[in-house]
Amino acid sequence: VHLFYLDDAKYILEAGADMVAHSVRDLTVDEAFINLFKEKDKCYVPTVTREVSTFVYESEPEFFSDPYFLKEVDPAVIEELRGPERQARMRNSRSAQGYKKGLDVAMANIGALYKGGVKIAMGTDTGLPGRFQGYFEQMEMHMMVEAGMSPMDVIRASTGVAAACINQGDIGTLEPGKWADLIVLGANPAEDIQNTKTIESVWIAGNRVPE
């Protein structure tokens, strides 16, 4: 279920929802909510980069100078997002500025839910304009660490936990009988989550994807 408000999150959990998406962004979660989440054994998907995308283009974002981002992005899209009129509209958008405040609440709630033992899965709203597939998944993982999760738990949230949350038992972990979907990295992301960017090869069903 997609939501914004804490009261709605409590209601839908009581009603039997399987998953909460887009974060609680109006209030800090309380102990009752954390306990309810654990009691129901459901999944929380923060999607904080969705919030980022609603206001970050009010000026030029830092990642516009990231070589990892620039390697694949369409330059025409960057130029469009740099447009002064577009930036001004976003700066003057009440909803955009509201989502900016909501992001702070969402980040605090990730940390509280993680410390409380709630099952957290990585997810994004990528694919829409300004929400770059691949790069925003990386950003989401990095922000989850900033919010207080350990790098290893973010990796789990992005693989095995996420697969379990959508009842996909044949993916998410490397085990006999499962799909051999994996990436090979040049540095250890458990030491620094930014190392998820050091991709050397991608494998799907045991087959290396051509570069």
Identify the meaning behind each predicted range.
Residues 202:
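Short aromatic-centered micro-motifs
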Residues 191:
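Small/polar (Gly/Ser/Thr/Ala-rich) solvent-exposed segments
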